[in-house]
Amino acid sequence: MVQPDNLEPKMILFVEDESLSRRAFAQILRAKGYQVAEAQNGVEALEVLNTGTEVLIKKAFDLVITDLVLPGLHGVNLIHQIRARWPKMPIIVISGYLPETPGKVILEGFAEFIQKPIDPAALIAAVRRLLPEKV
């Protein structure tokens, strides 16, 4: 996909501990013209959000997509920490659990919920709803 000169690709952080799934969906997003950084757990995601944008890519993230069940720092805790530092960051939660299963604690923190197994078309549609200026 060709970007107009005045539009930079939107930057997405994809957080998923299952490497095959993370890589596959990151590639799908890249094929749609998005820049995608990957993290395999919540701790790594915070490191990328805190330093990656300053050191590696010199650009802020536009969206976070995260699994709910992650090793180390659970997805709910990750969402709370993202909200504390970046209150307007849109977040898509992907999970094999129904949205009511983790409880209301996460409902305040995310913009979209996608049930696993992930339908690629549903993922792209959710991203486009949250990043509407991206064609």
PLM region spans:
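Non-catalytic signal-transmission and effector/linker regions of two-component phosphorelay proteins
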Residues: M1-L13, R23, K32, T53-A60, ...
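Conserved acidic carboxylate
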Residues: E16
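Two-component/phosphorelay signaling modules centered on CheY-like receiver
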Residues: S19-E38, P120
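Acidic, metal-coordinating helix/loop segments flanking the phosphotransfer/catalytic sites
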Residues: E38-L63
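Acidic catalytic/metal-coordinating carboxylates
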Residues: N41, H74-N77
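Short amphipathic alpha-helix used as the core "switch/output" element in two-component signaling
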Residues: E47, V76-P87
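Active-site residues of response regulator receiver
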Residues: D67, S95
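Alpha4 helix (beta4-alpha4-beta5 surface) of REC/receiver domains from two-component response regulators
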Residues: N77, A84, Y97-Q115, A121, ...
